[in-house]
A protein has these predicted regions:
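Small/aliphatic-rich secondary-structure junction motif
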Residues: 2-56, 154-212, 231-233
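A short acidic, glycine-rich active-site loop
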Residues: 57-70
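Short, aromatic/basic amphipathic alpha-helical patches
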Residues: 75-76, 129, 195-205, 246-250
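Charged docking surfaces used in two-component/phosphorelay signaling
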Residues: 91-99, 217-218
Length: 250
């Protein structure tokens, strides 16, 4: 557990039908690390206001506000009741990326959770919001398969760009791994000379490491390995010394 204060877990939701899976998994993670959960949704203003008349536009915003509030509260309430954990739902209208950036700066979460979109081709960072968050948020990011089961014991965990020794600031990773399926899949992109000398993280048990040389298709290859090994929860751990390949994901 984090010293003094609870971990702040921020779940970014698009309120699609499978959003409940992402939120359920996030709340289970929060329970393991004794964290608190914020649920955040942004609706494009252009999707709400389509009338040129000011009065009609204001009425449309008000109607959408009530509808989104009801939907968000329903989602948070249903998961909160099942998992017995408080979820704070918040939403806003405007530019999606700007609103997310502002919310992150204001609330200062420790962990940001996003759902990984379904795709015919495996895509590690296919959604435009994911690379944006990776660029703007320097904390730790959880990418959760939207098809995942909410029970953390049934999860298959992957680590991307993890350091050789997961430090104490990342102790929540150890808590989650302890409840997940084994082995953990660790993915890293590195120079050939570095890759030849690297091995498994000695602080983690039952880790299968995949080290790829730097090249244009490295992330695509990792994505294929994720799909093959059915990894449905990926930890993206960034440090100040993060390599150009990792920061280049954005």
């Amino acid at each position: 557990m984090k010293n003094n204060n609870k971990y702040k877990v921020l779940v970014l939701s698009d309120l699609t039908d499978d959003s409940i899976n992402v939120l359920q998994t996030a709340t289970k993670v929060a329970q393991i690390i004794d964290g608190q959960v914020d649920l955040f949704h942004v609706r494009k203003a252009t999707n709400v206001v389509k009338q040129s008349n000011q009065l009609a536009a204001m009425r449309a915003i008000n109607d959408n506000y009530k509808a989104i509030e009801k939907e968000l509260n329903s989602l948070a309430g249903s998961v909160s009741e099942i998992d017995e954990i408080k979820i704070n739902p918040v939403f806003s209208f405007g530019n999606i990326k700007k609103q997310i950036e502002n919310h992150i700066e204001t609330t200062k979460p420790d962990i940001v959770v996003l759902g990984k979109r379904k795709s015919v081709k495996p895509a590690l960072f296919g959604d435009k919001i994911i690379p944006f968050v990776l660029k703007k948020f320097k904390g730790e990011v959880l990418l959760i398969d939207k098809d995942t089961v909410w029970d953390t014991q049934a999860l298959s965990v992957g680590l991307f760009n993890a350091t050789d020794n997961v430090d104490s600031n990342s102790q929540f990773i150890h808590h989650v791994i302890a409840r997940s399926e084994k082995p953990v899949r660790a993915f890293k992109v590195a120079d050939k000379t570095i890759a030849e000398n690297e091995g498994n993280d000695p602080t983690l048990k039952e880790v299968v490491s995949y080290i790829f040389e730097k090249h244009d298709d490295a992330l695509k290859t990792i994505s294929n390995y994720m799909s093959k090994n059915k990894v449905n929860l990926m930890f993206v751990d960034r440090k100040p010394s993060t390599s150009k390949v990792a920061t280049g994901l954005s």
